[in-house]
């Protein structure tokens, strides 16, 4: 029989047996094998005892892709719908305006931010060249910004500008721009980055009823208003919005001090850096380098070049001779005054619709804020910059209303977070610590370089924006205090955006001295309190966009202002010509004796002349007036009339000073110093200044229907024109003007109502769009987040699947190996069964043989016993026989011993006898010898 694997002691070193060690580990018994050598030959060799492990086979991988060479599901990620897809889809849109507006390319910028502050509290974030670090926002000095103002194009002949500067016209007002293009700027509350859909088209005629709430969301600076009037006056081309090159920011950081002085002293209307409108200009790198090298010269040339783009008339430009670095040593009253050029005569205006139709189609970038209708405000400067002391003019105000209003304004403006803050866009070169100096002149500190004042326009076109520029319920008496003529400017020009008050009390006094179109003539506080309640209610934060831009506007608008014709409804005379203005050298402060040098040596009685023209002026002083006429050496010649009705000055308190007079462009009138603070320059207060009870500022305005005396007429003509009319004539003229003002107020209210309706519609639409944008943003973010999560999970599942496949392949390999081993084990078991049967047969044979051997053993045992018995008997017989023989031998031996003993005795006796004989013989011999 043949055996395969018996046990460990019979197994050899076989590979098959080695693989069985895991499942069948034979144990050694230590017993010798009972198999025959022929059976041992059939066994495999005995394996070496070793501990083996179940190992998974490493799958084959592609040497290039390192992927497992097994079939698996393709790991293709799902096509995720990203925000870029929305951007690409939006870029493929081609929206169109109504038939009056031709379709133009759409510029869309979409970006998503996680920060979603309330869109109703955020102002419009314009796309300017600012680099604001909101983490270090408290350390920012907003009055020394590192970003250059968006000036006019640097040079008129620069190749980077796509349009000639002389043919460009800056930002159109909001109501006209709503027809010319649609620019949707998604505020930072929703997307934190603008989604601007921009259209440009042929401008249609603009009616008065198109005054919309865009004035609230898009505050226009003086240059923006002037641009609108420039569009009405001449057919200029609309300037393209061109992005500002990034190098400008770097140049601004390098030459910030230089740019602060030279930044647009004659800034063109195309850029309104004091407000939220920004008309970016394309500046190439070479332009930026030239701007860096020769900043001041470039800024001056820019101002001159862009001023010519407004109108063919020269623009008066003011220059102040002082060094801002030596500001502590400067005496503002000895700076020589503002060297103001003579203003040219105004020119007629053409109907706006006729001129706007001829404007060249250019895309104009405009931004809409569909908030809840707030005037887009700027956040006040960071509180860590230190508080400025109040000016004396603000400190002397008797009325507490401005303080209450300023507290409300401060609370209101303090609401926006630091992320919403918009850094003021003007740069200043004065120290705030100098405001406690009584000799400090805030208007002589270099000023900000802001766009010039606007041209005049019909009153009816702009009345809605007079009191409805904002819609918040908090009315500010301070804003109406410091800009009493702004209402008239808005009624006459319709587009002057009042500067925005920052909300701090110390800043309010600064804004009062720096309001747009303000002169330094004092305004009675009663005039502001007499304003109609409707105006106070609908003039929410008649905020001056920023105090700093306001101060810049005051000086800059006086420097590059094109004097338009005052558009009164029934004006009786035109503005004075260049010959009627004083020379710049005569604007210095001089004593009265030097002024009236021809015999009139006594000082002018200022108090009397100040009270002239007011309701405190009594007819009893006509005698005094006649005395002045009689003894005035200037009356030697016949009086000359430079204008009709030049004596018509207000004699009663007005609702607002600008309700009576139309706004005269600031460049035509210098800043007349306050009576109580500064001495009179060359008798200008004789020419129509009237007494005020407060130190606030008053705008020297041109009347809508009655002209004011020109303060720049020669001294003799001015005094003659002032004194030749009686108080009754002036009262009658003022009454007529007041009636006309009341009519205008009614029109203002009507336009207010229309504006409020449109404004509410815009507010609702803005809220809807804001919510819609927020929803879209949230949906996009959620979708993006879900897709990213799903993508991560899918990648994780794919990795797990791949790992499971690898494990499965290894398990399959291991299982196949185990199966083979199992088959071998089955074969081994069959061999063991066969061996068992063989062993059983052997055992039976062994038992039979054992029985036979036992029988043989018994037989052998009996035979051996018999043999032993016989041997024993023989041994006993031999023993007895030997015993008897031994006894006989012993007796014989004893007998022999006795013989020996007897012989020994006989020998001894013989020897003794021999010895005795010997001795005897010896003795005998001796004796014989002796003998």
From Swiss-Prot:
One of its GO terms (molecular function) is translation initiation factor binding. One of its GO terms (biological process) is cell division. The keyword Phosphoprotein applies. Residues 549-558 have a biased composition (Basic and acidic residues). It is found in: Cytoplasm; Cytoplasm, Cytoskeleton, Spindle pole; Cytoplasm, Cytoskeleton, Spindle. Keywords: Cell cycle, Cell division, Coiled coil, Cytoplasm, Cytoskeleton, Mitosis, Phosphoprotein, Protein synthesis inhibitor, Repressor, Translation regulation. The modification Phosphoserine is found at residues 33, 620, 626. The keyword RNA-binding does not apply. Belongs to the TACC family. This is Transforming acidic coiled-coil-containing protein 3.
